[in-house]
């Protein structure tokens, strides 16, 4: 569960409506793979991940980023039940994919960075703080099965 004030909820919902989630997802996942190259090991089937330009232009990275951000979007609709919303994905990433749960936090930070890039001056420090709460809640929910 994420506890947001009414002002934080308004900021998150208002700003989220101003971005193209598909662009945010692909760019955030791409940045994760570039900035933290050890995360590439989970994406062997994605083809060429040999350089930043290859990663950022990779259609499989963009497609998976879209899936990631669609799940994130579902989380925004269920901030009071993130553990329930992400239970299946938590189990999948823990039991089948064996993803290090720290990567969820790293990806959340990439989402925040990309939002800042796309929203510019509208992404105020208060808006960033609200989104940091959300991505921390999502990362915690995704890591829930690991506990």
Curated annotation (Swiss-Prot):
SUPFAM superfamilies: Globin-like. Red blood cells. The modification N-acetylvaline is found at residue 2. GO terms for cellular component: extracellular space; haptoglobin-hemoglobin complex; hemoglobin complex. Residues 3-147 form the Globin domain. The modification Phosphoserine is found at residues 45, 51, 53. Heme b binds at residues 64, 93. The modification Phosphothreonine is found at residue 124. Belongs to the globin family. Involved in oxygen transport from the lung to the various peripheral tissues. This is Hemoglobin subunit beta-1.
